[in-house]
């Protein structure tokens, strides 16, 4: 495990760390087999591109979530080492804490805190969706806390980190329904002097991927912002990021939301399970911020720090300023002089997904 030892036992200057040792430990494979009942299917919490996640209980009674890689190769060796390195660096209350890892033989496993409220997607579209546990206050808390986590990765982690896979299933919820962003399997460490084009990853479009990342596979901070914008609209509406209209056509959530914004029909966007409990101005703000993040032109998207500022700002003047953005003006208005300009602006948020045949989450 030269790669793993390299990233966990030494600093980036090659010297052994004397301080700031990670607060997690190495687990034995035997210990994790016992905790998960030999990775029993009944303990399985979910499955992602890198592997499966299992619930477990240690000898002291504490609950854990164990991510077990399903395949192993040189590529996975690098991915695992990168993920451990990332997890060793980050310290933020809204990023999922790692308790340790296991690297024995061909087994590579990461051990996390267990989140009893599972993931955001389980409450929107999964096993808890019928219970409607997410009221408007909880959704706002999730929006702000997840934005703060990603902003931390972009601006305060050293080096900065691109998450690369922001979506509802990677937002876990603690006992207070605070977001715990997880899954840095596609994350990329970015030195401050990095001038590259980002990491290249092969992904299928799941509705959260920005147009430029979908085309090139290259991730960036701005592609994270796009994904977060989609996440905001999913959170507010309760809809999936992609809707299949017929066997050959899918529609991105922005294509449904933007026409309703033109009409200022924000009430039609909100999840019907919320009834009338939402605050109209706050709903409007979250939708507008989501659409600003999801513009197809990366240069026009806000930074995640700016997103946090917009979400926490309660000023009605700020909401009016957002609403006045040309992006939200109806291109079919009667003002012929503005039509061409506004149509160009509004097209920045529309993403055609008619050629995609992908899963919804």
Swiss-Prot record:
Chain residue ranges for the region called Disordered: 195-219, 323-361
Domain named Protein kinase: residues: 39-328
InterPro entries according to UniProt: CR_Ser/Thr_kinase, Kinase-like_dom_sf, Prot_kinase_dom, Protein_kinase_ATP_BS, Ser-Thr/Tyr_kinase_cat_dom, Tyr_kinase_AS
The entry's keywords: ATP-binding, Kinase, Nucleotide-binding, Transferase, Tyrosine-protein kinase
Classification lineage: Eukaryota, Viridiplantae, Streptophyta, Embryophyta, Tracheophyta
Binding-site positions, ATP: 45-53, 67
Family: Belongs to the protein kinase superfamily. Tyr protein kinase family.
Protein name: PTI1-like tyrosine-protein kinase At3g15890
Enzyme Commission identifier(s): 2.7.10.2
CDD domains: STKc_IRAK (cd14066)
UniProt catalytic activity: L-tyrosyl-[protein] + ATP = O-phospho-L-tyrosyl-[protein] + ADP + H(+)
Basic and acidic residues bias: start-end ranges: 351-361
Domain of life assignment: Eukaryota
């Amino acid at each position: 495990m030269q790669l793993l030892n390299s990233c966990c036992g030494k600093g980036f200057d090659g010297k052994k760390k004397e301080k700031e040792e990670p607060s997690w430990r190495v687990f034995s494979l035997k210990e994790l087999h016992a905790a998960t009942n030999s990775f029993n299917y009944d303990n399985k919490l979910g499955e992602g591109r890198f592997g499966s996640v299992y619930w477990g209980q240690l000898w002291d009674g504490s609950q854990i979530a164990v991510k077990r890689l399903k395949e192993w190769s040189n590529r996975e060796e690098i991915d695992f080492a990168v993920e451990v390195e990332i997890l060793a660096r980050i310290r933020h209350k809204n990023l999922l804490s790692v308790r340790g890892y296991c690297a024995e033989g061909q087994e590579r496993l990461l051990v996390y805190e267990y989140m009893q409220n599972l993931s955001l997607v389980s409450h929107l579209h999964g096993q808890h969706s019928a219970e409607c546990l997410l009221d408007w206050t909880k959704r706002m808390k999730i929006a702000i806390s997840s934005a703060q986590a990603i902003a931390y990765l972009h601006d305060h982690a050293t080096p900065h980190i691109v998450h690369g896979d922001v979506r509802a299933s990677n937002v876990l919820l603690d006992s207070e329904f605070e977001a715990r962003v997880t899954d840095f399997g596609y994350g990329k460490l970015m030195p401050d002097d990095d001038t590259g084009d980002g990491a290249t990853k092969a992904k299928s479009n799941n509705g959260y991927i920005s147009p430029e990342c979908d085309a090139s596979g290259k991730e960036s901070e701005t592609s994270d912002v796009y994904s977060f914008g989609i996440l905001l609209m999913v959170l507010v509406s309760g809809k999936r990021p992609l809707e299949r209209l017929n066997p050959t056509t899918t529609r991105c959530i922005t294509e449904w939301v933007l026409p309703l914004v033109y009409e200022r029909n924000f009430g039609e966007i909100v999840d019907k399970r919320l009834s009338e409990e939402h605050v109209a101005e706050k709903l409007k703000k979250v939708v507008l911020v989501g659409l600003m993040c999801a513009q197809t032109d990366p240069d026009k998207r806000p930074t995640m720090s700016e997103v946090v500022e917009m979400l926490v700002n309660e000023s009605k003047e700020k909401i009016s300023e957002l609403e006045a953005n040309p992006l939200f003006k109806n291109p079919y208005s009667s003002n012929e002089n503005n039509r061409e300009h506004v149509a160009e602006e509004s097209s920045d948020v529309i993403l055609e997904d008619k050629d995609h045949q992908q899963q919804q989450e």
